[in-house]
């Protein structure tokens, strides 16, 4: 025990005794001496040989280590919560069907600033839906599904209030498909919102999205599932729309298995309603990891790949087939520009397409840096993309504004006369130009 104690003391002298971690580590080391546990090698190359395969020392977490002894981690973290304790309170998806916001939004129309803008945007969305010739394109950027907006979008799809979706890959794969597998996003404590504890979260394999937690180990399952889907496909170039349709088919075939259960999903709802989903930057998400692994394993052989130009051509076909269009844009980025540009793309293909008749954007981005996300819809009109008669910018955070706009149109029954456009079927046969 004395020899072990001397080794531990050498390590302790290398720590900052004034730091909280140093003090806690000292306490653990002293506890090891009392338990007659030999000192471990804390080098990066050293690994525990127990089932957890964690790195010795503080470098990798999990439950116990054969070098430090069962219970060492609980002793080390002290007041720090375990992974199970942190991933407890689930993010809840708001249900617009349960909240009639019409009186509230109507009252906001008589106010000023963003309240009035939001009320006007809600009225434009209502008009967009009552125009049964209008093809409604929903654009999604930012981390929306993890924030509790999944059910809003699912309800819009199921009630014919959205005819096509353009999104970032994260919303569709890392968040929606992830939850369709039976996993969840969790509420983070206020102390974590601004970065306190991020190092500990990394040790626990918990990823943070501002005030929301996601289990990295579960994300790896999502990555692997997309690889399984990729491996099952005929090797060729796919549009992201085609690939996501295969994901929807996979959910349809597997959703009732015990490991997946019954869960809402945008991918599944769109598959069932033939609502196409486009992710122009599709590799920038969990699907990208699956595609990379697939192509790495098949070096020198035919592989599955994603063709973003095919995406652009397909969504332009929708504009040609359905000339009257409206945009409901949450955030900006690639989805916003991609959807706006189909007017110009149709013109390049020799079709005189009208500008988007309706356009709404919810954003907190600033127009003054010249970036796309904050560029106004009036600016887009100078490019020949958006008509100015029915357009509205709403400078507000999406989790507050989007449910109000969507809920307003839903409870006004604006979708009553709409029928399924099933745009995914249109893409089976390219439109003649």
For each predicted feature, which ranges?
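Short, low-complexity, charge-dense intrinsically disordered segments
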Residues: 2-3, 15-27, 41-44, 49-53, ...
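N-terminal glycine-rich anion-binding loop in soluble enzyme alpha/beta folds
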Residues: 80-122, 128
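C-terminal functional extensions of proteins
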Residues: 82, 86, 324, 348-433
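Glycine-rich phosphate/diphosphate-binding loops that line cofactor/substrate pockets in enzymes
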Residues: 122-135, 269-271, 317-324
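Glycine-rich anion-binding loop/nest that anchors nucleotide
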Residues: 136-145, 165, 278-282, 300-372
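A generic, well-ordered mixed alpha/beta core segment in the N-terminal half of proteins
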Residues: 153-221
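Ligand-binding beta-strand-loop-alpha-helix segment within the catalytic cores
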Residues: 197-287
């Amino acid at each position: 025990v004395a020899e072990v104690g001397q080794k531990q003391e050498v390590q302790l002298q290398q720590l900052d005794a004034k730091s909280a971690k140093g003090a806690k580590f000292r306490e653990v080391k002293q506890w090891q001496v009392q338990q007659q546990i030999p000192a471990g090698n804390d080098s990066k190359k050293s690994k525990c040989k127990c089932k957890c395969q964690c790195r010795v020392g503080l470098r990798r977490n999990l439950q116990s280590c054969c070098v430090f002894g069962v219970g060492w981690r609980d002793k080390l973290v002290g007041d720090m919560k375990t992974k199970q304790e942190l991933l407890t309170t689930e993010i809840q998806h708001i249900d617009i069907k349960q909240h009639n916001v019409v009186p509230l939004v109507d009252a906001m129309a008589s106010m000023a600033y963003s309240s009035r803008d939001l009320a006007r945007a809600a009225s434009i969305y209502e008009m967009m839906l009552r125009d049964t010739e209008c093809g409604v394109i929903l654009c999604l950027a930012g981390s929306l599904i993890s924030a509790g907006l999944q059910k809003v979008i699912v309800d819009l799809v199921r009630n014919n209030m959205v005819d096509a979706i353009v999104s970032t890959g994260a919303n569709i794969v890392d968040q929606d498909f992830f939850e369709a597998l039976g996993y969840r996003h969790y509420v983070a404590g206020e102390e974590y919102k601004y970065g306190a504890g991020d190092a500990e979260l990394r040790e626990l394999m918990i990823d943070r999205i501002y005030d929301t937690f996601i289990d990295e180990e579960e994300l790896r399952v999502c990555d692997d599932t997309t690889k399984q889907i990729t491996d099952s496909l005929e090797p060729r170039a796919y549009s992201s729309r085609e690939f996501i349709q295969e994901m929807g088919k996979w959910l349809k075939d597997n959703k009732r298995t015990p490991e997946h259960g019954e869960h809402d999903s945008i991918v599944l709802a769109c598959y069932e309603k033939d609502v196409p989903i486009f992710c122009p930057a599709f590799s920038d998400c969990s699907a990208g990891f699956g595609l990379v692994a697939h192509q790495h394993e098949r070096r020198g052989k035919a592989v599955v790949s994603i063709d973003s130009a095919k995406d652009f051509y397909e969504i332009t076909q929708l504009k040609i087939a359905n000339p009257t269009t409206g945009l409901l844009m949450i955030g900006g980025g690639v989805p916003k520009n991609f959807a706006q540009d189909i007017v110009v793309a149709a013109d390049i293909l020799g079709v005189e397409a009208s500008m988007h008749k309706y356009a709404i954007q919810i954003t907190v981005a600033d127009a003054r840096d010249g970036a796309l996300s904050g560029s106004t819809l009036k600016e887009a009109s100078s490019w020949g993309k958006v008509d100015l008669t029915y357009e509205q910018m709403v400078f507000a955070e999406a989790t507050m504004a989007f449910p109000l706009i969507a809920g307003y149109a839903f409870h006004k029954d604006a979708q009553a006369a709409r029928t399924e456009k099933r745009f995914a079927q249109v893409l089976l046969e390219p439109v003649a130009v």
